[in-house]
């Protein structure tokens, strides 16, 4: 969690090892005290910490707009004196570039950074979640914005090549699991 990442970033700072820590959490977590406590602490202590919020528009089975008082989660970081970004979390290239930029800021300016990646949860929150709170039109819209398919299209990677890569990754994962 976020608290663990903050602790690790404190260790990174004390060791002066040039590493940063990354806290990855969903939009629902931004309403929890631990996130704000860690954002404050990271800012006060200038911790090498990247806060990466995956805003998938839903907290459990309710729209984020019903659970969060703002439509711009990333702007909350301004109050903690952090550089902050809101990005298209379905654009793999933009995510990579923004994370690289954030890492550079963290190391050069000695301050934490906050990224809000706007994305979509394709599946339910759990196995018992049947997604009755979402429209089929909404799901179709976001399915067309699938990050892997978008990336493959931008890089001219065919579906056949993607399927081959997926198979190799699954085989590798299975071998690793069996040898563990």
Language-model features: locations:
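Glycine-rich ThDP/TPP pyrophosphate-binding loop and its adjacent helix/strand module
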Residues: 2-178
């Amino acid at each position: 969690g976020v608290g663990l990442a903050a602790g690790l970033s404190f260790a990174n700072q004390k060791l002066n090892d040039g590493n940063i820590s990354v806290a990855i959490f969903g939009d629902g977590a931004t309403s929890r005290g631990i996130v704000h406590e860690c954002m404050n602490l990271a800012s006060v202590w200038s911790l090498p910490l990247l806060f990466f919020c995956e805003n998938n528009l839903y907290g459990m089975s309710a729209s984020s707009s019903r659970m969060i008082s703002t439509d711009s989660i990333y702007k909350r970081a301004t109050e903690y004196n952090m550089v902050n970004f809101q990005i298209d979390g379905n654009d793999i290239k933009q995510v990579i570039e923004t994370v690289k930029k954030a890492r550079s800021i963290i190391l050069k300016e000695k301050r934490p950074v906050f990224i809000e990646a706007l994305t979509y949860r394709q599946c339910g929150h759990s196995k018992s979640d049947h997604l009755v709170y979402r429209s089929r039109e909404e799901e179709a819209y976001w399915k067309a914005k699938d990050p892997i398919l978008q990336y493959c299209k931008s890089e001219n990677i065919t579906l056949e090549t993607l399927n081959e890569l997926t198979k190799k990754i699954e085989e590798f994962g299975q071998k690793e699991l069996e040898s563990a």
